Amino acid sequence: KGKSEKLIGEVFSGMRNEVVISTKYSYDFENVDQIGHKELPQRFDPEFTNRALKNSLARLQTDYIDVYGLHNPKLRHIHDDTIFQTLDGLIGEGKIKTYQVALGPAIGWTEEGIEAMERKNVSAVQTVYNILEQTPGNELIERGAEKDVGILVRVPDASGILTGKVNENTKI
């Protein structure tokens, strides 16, 4: 729970001005025990947003986040102005520099990405994109270029399939 942030905080301690730090929030992993692969509850309300950010800042050993991301927001979240007013307030307080939407697996999510670029002050959209999974990436990349919104690619190696380490003899 927050292990990656703790590790990043330790590794880059004393080097804050030399790195760009991005993290994301929405899943309430601190107050819920995860059982299996069931999705954890998502929260974007102001109280949770502030608490999640405070905890991330502590784990990352910094006083601000360069790019703060909404993790897998659904369309109803993109349309919720309160969420983005909270994030704009955090920019005003100097706790984050900008924010993004970090979208889920490649199937679907096109509308969420486009709506975020069209209607909200996002600086970037994070999406799955690789030679095997180009939807919705192609459309989001095109729209991002039109709107001057950055695209952050995740899973560029198709979860290891494109590394050459997975072959017909690999047991899954």
Each model region followed by its residue ranges:
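N-terminal binding-site loop/beta-alpha segment at the start of enzyme catalytic domains
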Residues: K1-T23
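Alpha-helix N-cap and loop-to-helix initiation/capping positions
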Residues: K3, L7, L40-F48, L75-T82
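Beta/alpha (TIM)-barrel catalytic core signal, keyed to glycine-rich beta->alpha loops juxtaposed to Asp/Glu
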Residues: V11, P73-I172
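Short acidic capping loops at alpha-helix termini that bridge into adjacent secondary structure
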Residues: R16-V19, T23, D63-V67, G94-T98
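A short, structured active-site edge motif that brings together acidic residues
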Residues: E18-E30, T127
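Surface-exposed, active-site-proximal loop segments in enzymatic domains
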Residues: E30-R43
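Short, acidic/polar
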Residues: Q42-Q61, T82, G104-A116
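Active-site groove signature of glycoside hydrolases
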Residues: L57-R76
